[in-house]
């Protein structure tokens, strides 16, 4: 009897056993690495596709409050047409206003419903506390307490930017929708992160 394969999990496992990444580094020494890096970066940018057109940030600080040793702000800006980015910005109370301090962009990951909040040390829900305890997830808050300005953007599909699809993973839905248009969610999130830099420079 012929071998038959029905499982997509097994399919991907078998396909990857002999897979060699196209742009893996196979050289030796600094010169070879620099040439590989240039080629790999060009390929990465090609695969990411075009970034959106920038629009005026139209940034607003919706609130600014003292939170222990920190100043906690909610900022919203526009990163492109049809896309606004809510952020939490944390900075030490005694941070000089001369922009001499380093800033760190602190991004969230899964679970999608929590978004940026636990990264910024928000503890308004039991799930926030659980994520912070389990993953040491309030790293944006910790870095601000260590003297940095930190900004936590809400990445697309997470937290406030998460459309509810029931039990279906929003990342999958957004990937499929974007792929049809030749737009990738990762590219859009990188764009929003770049726009955080633009905001910090204002």
How would you label these PLM feature ranges?
Residues 15-18, 37, 74, 91, ...:
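Basic side chains
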Residues 29, 94, 185:
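Solvent-exposed, flexible loop/coil residues
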Residues 40-43, 90, 147, 199:
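Short alpha-helical scaffold segments that flank and stabilize functional sites
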Residues 99, 104-194, 199-202:
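Cap/lid segment of the alpha/beta-hydrolase catalytic domain
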Residues 1-71, 79:
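N-terminal targeting or regulatory segments adjacent to alpha/beta-hydrolase or S9 domains
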Residues 36, 40, 44, 83, ...:
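Alpha-helical packing segments of well-folded alpha/beta enzyme cores
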Residues 64-124:
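Glycine-rich active-site/cofactor-binding loop and its immediate structural neighborhood
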Residues 26, 74, 178-182:
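Glycine- and acidic
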């Amino acid at each position: 009897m012929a071998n038959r394969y029905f499982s997509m999990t097994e399919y991907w496992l078998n396909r990857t056993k002999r897979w060699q990444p196209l742009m893996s580094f196979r050289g030796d020494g600094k010169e070879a690495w620099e040439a590989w890096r240039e080629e790999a970066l060009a390929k990465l940018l090609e695969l990411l596709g075009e970034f959106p057109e920038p629009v005026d940030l139209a940034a607003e600080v919706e609130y600014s409050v003292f939170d222990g040793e920190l100043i906690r702000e909610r900022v919203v800006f526009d990163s492109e047409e049809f896309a606004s980015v809510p952020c939490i910005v944390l900075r030490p109370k005694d941070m000089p206003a001369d922009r001499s301090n380093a800033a760190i962009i602190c991004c969230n990951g899964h679970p999608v419903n929590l978004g940026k909040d636990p990264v910024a040390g928000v503890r308004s829900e039991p799930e926030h506390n659980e994520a912070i305890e389990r993953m040491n997830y309030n790293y944006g808050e910790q870095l601000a307490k260590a003297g940095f300005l930190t900004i936590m953007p809400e990445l697309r599909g997470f937290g406030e930017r998460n459309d509810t699809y029931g039990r279906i993973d929003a990342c999958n839905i957004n990937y499929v929708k974007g792929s049809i248009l030749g737009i990738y969610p990762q590219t859009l999130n990188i764009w929003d992160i770049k726009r955080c830099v633009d905001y910090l420079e204002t």
